[in-house]
Amino acid sequence: MTHVNLITGFLGSGKTTLLCHLLAARPAGETWAVLVNEFGEIGIDGALLADRGATLKEIPGGCLCCVNGLPMQVGLNMLLKSNPDRLLIEPTGLGHPRQVLEMLSAPVYQAWLQLNATLTLLDARQLADPRIVANENFRDQLAAADIIIANKRDCWDEEDRLRLADWQQQMQPLRPLIETEFGQIPLSLLDTPYQSRELPVPHHHHPANHASGLAALRLDGEARWRRALNHGQGYSACGWLFDADTLFDSDALLEWVRQAQVDRIKGVMRTAEGTMRINCQAKDLQSETLTSPPPDSRIEIIHSQQTDWNRLQSALLKCRLR
C-alpha cells in the first residue's frame, strides 16, 4: 500500500524546496513518487525535481481538480501502477485541496493507498499582505492542513513573528505548527495520520485556456523557443521554453529577474557555467549553478497585475549568448 501526503501552500511558500529536502532524506530501499501540478504550462517544478531519485509525473496548466479531476486520476493511476512506498502530491499554489483530498479518500483507492497528513506551508510574511490573506485558496489550503509548516523562518523580522503568533492563537481548529527554514522538516511528519474535516467549497474560476494534458510544454519542429500563457484566479502566468542549443548569460539573466518586479519567477536555465536554477518570490531571489546541464531551458513568471509580457520577453531574449 502506498502512503500518500498532500503538500500544499500558497505561491512562494517553499513547497518545491521542501520536496527536494524530503527526497534527499528518502530511506534507502524505499521507492517514492511525486505528482506535481503547476498553474503555468511550462513545467518548471518537474525540471527542479528531476534526478532526485523519485518517479515524477507533471500536470501543468491549472489545478488538479479541473476537468472533473481527469488529469489527476490519470496521473495518479499511472504512478500507483508501480506501487511506490510513498507518493507526495504538490498541487499548484493557486489550487484548492478539497477535491484532491476527496478523490484520494474515495473507496476506489482504499485498497491502493493510505492517506496521511496534509502539510501546508506558510511564510509568516504572507500574513502581512492583504491580497494573500483575502485569497480564497490561501485560506482553504490552511484550513485543510493537518500540520502547518511555518517556512522561511530565516527571512522573518519581529513583526512577522508577532503576526504569526497572533494568527496561531486564532487558528481553529488548533493544529501543530512547526517553524523551519529551507523546508527542512523531520521525515517522521509524513506518517502523521490524516484528519478528515469539512472543508469550504471552492468558488475559484478556471482559466478559459486551461490545459488538460498530462505533460509539460515541448518545442515543435525546428522551433528554437516558444511562449505559453495561462490566466485564472486573479493571476497570469507566462513561460518560455528554449532548446538545448540556447545558452544564457548568467549575470544578465539574474539582472533580468531582479528587474522584472513580479510576484513569482522560477526557472531552470542552460548557461555557459552549467545549469542555473532560479527561484524568486517578490524580492527574495535564490539561485544555484550545477555542472550538469538540463535538456532545455524553462522559465516562468506568475503575477497578479497586468503585465507587459512582450517587454519582458524582449529583455529575456537579449540575455542569450547564442
Task: Please annotate each region the language model reported.
Residues 86-181, 185:
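Phosphate/Mg2+-binding loops and adjacent switch elements
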Residues 302:
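Flexible loop/N-cap segments at domain edges
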Residues 147, 155-295, 305-310, 314-322:
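C-terminal accessory "lid"/substrate-recognition subdomains
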Residues 2-8, 13, 17-131:
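Nucleotide-state-sensitive switch-loop elements of NTP-binding domains
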Residues 60, 88, 152, 240-241:
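Conserved short-loop catalytic and cofactor-binding motifs
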